[in-house]
Amino acid sequence: MDGLRKLAVAAIAVLAVPPLFSQPGVVGTDSGKLQGVTQGSVESFKGVPFAAPPVGELRWRAPQPVQQWSDVRAANAYSADCMQVPFPSDAAPLGTKPAEDCLYLNVWRPAGTNADAKLPVMFWIYGGGFVNGGSSPAVYDGSKFAEKGVVLVSANYRLGRFGFFAFPELTKENADGMVGNYGFMDQIAALKWVQKNISAFGGDPANVTVFGESAGGFSVSMLLTSPLSQGLFSKAIIESGGGRTNLGGQRYLNTALPNGPASAESVGIEFARSVGVDATGKDALDKLRHLSAEQVLGNLNMATMNQPGYAGPFIDGRVVLSDPQSVYLSGAGWHVPLMIGTNSMDIGFGFARDKEELFAPFGNDREKAIAAYDPTGKGELRTVQYQVSMDRFMVEPARFVASIFASEGLPAYEYRFSYVAKSMRSKWPGAPHATEIPFVFDTVQAKYGSELAPEDEKIAQAMLNYWVSFARTGDPSTANTPAWPRYSTATDMLMDFTENGPVAEKDPLKARLDVTAAYVTSSAPAPAPKLPARP
């Protein structure tokens, strides 16, 4: 009882102290003036529209301009996240109720920043398999970046069938090729907003770093390889975002490869049939646009991603030229400094019935694969299969992308996040997918609450400093952190975030990744033809 009384008194004391909020100066954008909120040393502007609401006749269209407003607009709360079926075990639970009207962004900056400050800008892209996610989760709060002198921007983008949908009539309606990958178009539109407006917030439009995790990392790969993102950013960070393939496989707009997934248009036609719309009817598209948001949404979320009707990115030839690997190898894409990495217990999956089936695809390198992944022959199938699939899907592709950038003389830095929060060490043998995010944002208090340990905070502060330094200079190393060596194939060095702190080391998974690289290279699709040259 005594402990409960102390908690009650503490709670009353907290409630009795007014929050340190005040009204900052008004900021003007190309659409109108904004009034944000100051909390301590940080000013935030939330729920800022960067495109017209994509509803009604604007459903399944490229983002359109915002209607200007004349009064000062209050920018004091997150807008709705984009339409989705929330995922119960999401590592970043939403802070708002999803809605179709969702194309809004958020800005954090140091309080009192002048318009001519030219601070580095960081643009965050959330993950969620392109069917979940949003900018409102507490772990994505940009305040700690602002405290370090960064202007941080996060933006919503359309998800699921709202963000990634193809249909024959849509293709005919958009002769310019801006069809299907609306979620990516939203990201590009938000980055264009940054170029036009961020200087009013004290940010430098010539120093923008895009960074994202999982689907957000795949999105950064898209931005690095899309001709439509030219000049919109100057650095990139990919967290657990693959790098060789598109999420969802080698799906095309209206064709399908042998043994590949159905075309995006075929998926759209099947969806129309499922809601009683004749895909060949003259009014089919009109009927689809008049469906309720709930009808379009269906049951898509991260738990149903393996269903045939998954609505994710596809190759359209305009926004998405090809799979990232083909674009990188063809010499197309954008020359920028890069940070890239994965977690020590990142995404892995597989369906092999035994080890014979698991290692058979390695062909002539089968014995090398066994030596790398199961040297004693006593490893559990589930564990070995997980490591093989994790390396194939996440870890080796990250090294591949780092090697491509390094070979072109670009600064490339690879990391591995092995740190496990102290309160989770009895449950997790390694760092699962997405667990680095609260450490990058230094929002570990929001994530772990009373279970937060001092060593957790120390790693969070180190990671935040590395990310900020990279955004500021293109080099993550700082005077107060261990030096982070540039990646090269000759040294294979990376920065591992461990329970002992950041450790620069030669990649201990090199043998595994070498044999996996040989396999994925031999089984990769042919490079796409006629890709534009990298400028």
Describe each region flagged by the PLM.
Residues F87-A279, R318-S322, S326-R353, S407-L410, ...:
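Serine-hydrolase-like catalytic core of hydrolytic proteins
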Residues R158-R161, F211-A215, R416-S423, P482-S488:
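Short, solvent-exposed turn/loop segments enriched in Gly/Ser/Thr/Pro and often Arg
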Residues M1-V9:
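Bacterial N-terminal signal peptides that target proteins for export
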Residues K235, L247-G248, L253, D283-E455, ...:
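Substrate-gating cap/lid region and adjacent catalytic-acid/histidine neighborhood
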Residues F21-N181, A446, S450-M463, R472-A483, ...:
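Non-catalytic accessory segments of hydrolases
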Residues V9-A10, L20:
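Cleavable N-terminal signal peptides
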Residues V66, V275-K287:
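Short, charged, surface-exposed loops that flank catalytic or proteolytic processing sites
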